[in-house]
A protein has these predicted regions:
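Conserved C-terminal helix/tail region of periplasmic/extracytoplasmic solute-binding proteins
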Residues: 292-319
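Pocket-lining segment of extracytoplasmic ligand-binding domains
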Residues: 89, 168-258
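Extracytoplasmic/secreted envelope proteins and their assembly/folding machinery
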Residues: 43, 52, 73, 77, ...
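Short, glycine-/small- and polar/acidic-enriched structural segments
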Residues: 27-166, 170-176, 180-186, 199-208
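Bacterial N-terminal signal peptides
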Residues: 9-20
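Secondary-structure end/capping motifs
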Residues: 222-302
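Bacterial N-terminal signal peptides that target proteins for export
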Residues: 1-10
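Sec/Tat signal peptide C-region and signal peptidase I cleavage site
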Residues: 20-26
Length: 319
C-alpha cells in the first residue's frame, strides 16, 4: 500500500489550522475612519476608546482623522469618514439638511469655563464689559448667549461679545485686557487660571447640551446597523470604564499624557470631567432641544424641528 504523500499531509494540516486557529491568533481588523476637529474634552472618549483598545475589541482598527468642523461634516456626508465625534455641530448640520444622526453621547454637558479677571465675582458684573468667544455662531457663542440671558443680561446691549479665536488666543486676549472675560473649554480654562485669572463658573452648570459623542450618516445606519452597534458599544464601554472610580489611576494617567497637565491640574480636571460624562450613551431630548433653540436664535434655521428626528439612540439600548 502506498504511503500518503507529503501533499496530503500538508493539505490536512492547513485544513486543521483554518478550522482551529491558534488561541490569540490575530484576526483581521476592520478599518473605520472617525473625523475629529479637536483633541479636547468633547472628543476625548473616542480617543480613549481607540488608545485603550475598546474599538479593537469590537474588531475595529479605528483611525481618527483631524478635519476642521465643516470639512469633517462634508467628508462624513460624502462617505469619506464613517463616523464623527462631533455632536452639537453634527446636529446643527442635520438641521441644515445633511443626512446625519447623533447615535451616542459621551458628554452630557460641556466644560466651558467662564474665565474672568480676579476682581469680577459674579456674572452680573460683566455688564458693560467684553466677553471673548471662539467665533460668532459657534457653540461657545451659543453658551455665552445662554449664560448671559440666564443671569438677566442682554447679549450685545449689556455685554459686548468679541470673536477672539481659539483657546490660546482667548487667553492672550485676557492677558492683554482686550476682553474682561472669555468662554474657554477645559482644560484650557485651568491654564488661564494659572496665568492669574479665575474660573467664575462652568457654563455647563446651566447650559446643559450634549458636547461629545458619535454621529454617522443615515445611509450607514440603514446599510450596516451591526457595525454601528459595535462602534457605539465600544464608545459607551470606554466611557463607563473612564468614569468608574476603580479605574481612576488609568483615567488620570491618560489625562496627564494627552493634555500635558501637572498632578494637581489633572486631579482637578478629573473632578470636573467625570460628572459631565453620560455613561449610558444618551441624553434627554430636552438637551437636544437646546441645540435646536440655539440654531433658531442664531438664524441657522427658520422653523422648529422635533429633537427625536435628529438622533438615533436605538443602538445604545440594551448595552
Amino acid at each position: 500500500m502506498r504511503e500518503p504523500s507529503k501533499f496530503v499531509f500538508t493539505a490536512i494540516a492547513l485544513i486543521w489550522l483554518m478550522a482551529f486557529p491558534r488561541p490569540g491568533a490575530a484576526q483581521a481588523l476592520q478599518e473605520i475612519r472617525i473625523g475629529s476637529s479637536v483633541i479636547g474634552f468633547s472628543s476625548l472618549m473616542s480617543y480613549f476608546a481607540r488608545d485603550l483598545k475598546f474599538f479593537e475589541r469590537e474588531g475595529f482598527d479605528a483611525k481618527i482623522i483631524y478635519a476642521q468642523t465643516n470639512v469633517g461634516l462634508a467628508a462624513l456626508t460624502a462617505g469619506n469618514f464613517d463616523y464623527s465625534n462631533l455632536t452639537t455641530s453634527a446636529v446643527e448640520a442635520t438641521l441644515r439638511g445633511m443626512p446625519l444622526r447623533l447615535i451616542a453621547v459621551t458628554n452630557a454637558e460641556p466644560l466651558w469655563g467662564i474665565v474672568v479677571r480676579k476682581d469680577i465675582t459674579q456674572i452680573s458684573e460683566l455688564k458693560g464689559k467684553k466677553l471673548g468667544v471662539s467665533s460668532f455662531g459657534g457653540t461657545s457663542y451659543s453658551a455665552a448667549l445662554y449664560v448671559l440671558k440666564h443671569f438677566g443680561l442682554r447679549p450685545k446691549e449689556d455685554v459686548t461679545l468679541l470673536a477672539t479665536g481659539g483657546t490660546t488666543e482667548r487667553i492672550a486676549a485676557l492677558k492683554h485686557a482686550s476682553v474682561d472675560a472669555a468662554v474657554i473649554p477645559a482644560p484650557g480654562d485651568m491654564k488661564a487660571e494659572q496665568e492669574g485669572f479665575k474660573i467664575l463658573m462652568d457654563a455647563g452648570a446651566v447650559y446643559k447640551l450634549p458636547n461629545g459623542g458619535m454621529s454617522t450618516t443615515v445611509t450607514k445606519i440603514k446599510q450596516n446597523p451591526a457595525e454601528v452597534r459595535r462602534v457605539v458599544r465600544a464608545l459607551v464601554q470606554a466611557t463607563k470604564f473612564f468614569a468608574e472610580p476603580q479605574n481612576k489611576a488609568d483615567a488620570t494617567k491618560y489625562l496627564t499624557r494627552v493634555f500635558n497637565l501637572d498632578a494637581s491640574s489633572t486631579e482637578e480636571f478629573y473632578r470636573r470631567f467625570v460628572p459631565s460624562l453620560s455613561t449610558n450613551g444618551v441624553v434627554e431630548l430636552d438637551k437636544i432641544k437646546l441645540i435646536v433653540d440655539g440654531a433658531l436664535e442664531r438664524g441657522l434655521i427658520t422653523k422648529r424641528v422635533e429633537p427625536e428626528t435628529l438622533v438615533d439612540f436605538s443602538f445604545v439600548k440594551g448595552l
